[in-house]
Amino acid sequence: MSNDLFAGIGVVPGTFLLPRPDANWTAWACVACDQYTSEPEYWQRVNTLVGHQPSTLRLILPECDLPAPPERIDAIHAAMRDALNVLHPGVTDGFVLLERTTSTGKRLGLVCCVDLEQYRYDGAKTLIRPTEETVASRLPARLAVRNGAPLESSHVMLLLDDPQRTVIEPLYALSLIHI
């Protein structure tokens, strides 16, 4: 798929590894590392729920655990290498349309790659910008996890201003592939 089709909109197609269809997708899924920063008990409950099953919980560093010792970063990298055994190339040069269940009902979403040339976190009025302030003191830990990491896990949610529902809902209506 040509990235020229997406020039100027801030997202591009990508290659996405997905858990095998027989995986426990509930255990695999995990909220972003910057959530529940003052609630370590939340993360303990998730850890208990996941147990020894493959999970993105093992691929992230929850911010409530900062600062992290180097051996924690090493454990995350080892978990990423292990995860490669339960992942398969679900999508190549494309997007992943998903339906997720939240406390307020079902929500649709689109997993995609962000064009980082269109992103700034310093308050600039770029096409893609955060909804909350970036805490610069937490960036070194994020960089430590990414340095030498064999995987990159999606961890941002972009909000789409589409009141007429012209983007995701028509794609969902096509129901191209279900996993």
Where are these regions (language model features)?
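N-terminal extension/subdomain marker
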Residues: S2-S175
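Conserved small/polar residues in nucleotide/adenosyl-binding loops
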Residues: I177-I179
